[in-house]
Amino acid sequence: MKKQIIAGLLAATALLSFGCSGRNAEFGVVDMHAVESKAAVVKTVQEEVTTKGKALQDEMNTALEGKTGDERKKVLEDYTSRMNVIRSEAQNKLKASLDTALNEVAKEKGLGAVLIKEAVPQGGVDVTEDVIAKMK
């Protein structure tokens, strides 16, 4: 019985030391709502999408004049596809900017991870303003 208790304690100690060693327990949190509303790059990208979307809409309306049936459907599909590409490029640009900012802030502050603030009930270092400042 004594051997089992000692073996259990050794196993628990080994698991704890293995699981905790070399890992940074500090983590950051970022408020994504604040990032979306305050980051200049978000506003710039949204304006670009709106401008390109309006131009595409005007172009589509011109292309649709006099079209009926299958021709009209084909034009609509083409312009919908082009708008989806514009949106996808905008999302990729924002994601790249956010990822770069998060990595830089985490490295500067020595954080093991940065999590979305809404998903963390408590704790963490709030890095929202730092992330907003670094987004380009």
Show which residues each predicted segment covers.
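Amphipathic, charged alpha-helical segments and their helix-to-coil junctions
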Residues: S21-K136
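C-terminal motif of bacterial Sec signal peptides marking the signal peptidase cleavage site
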Residues: L15-G19
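Bacterial N-terminal signal peptides that target proteins for export
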Residues: M1-A7
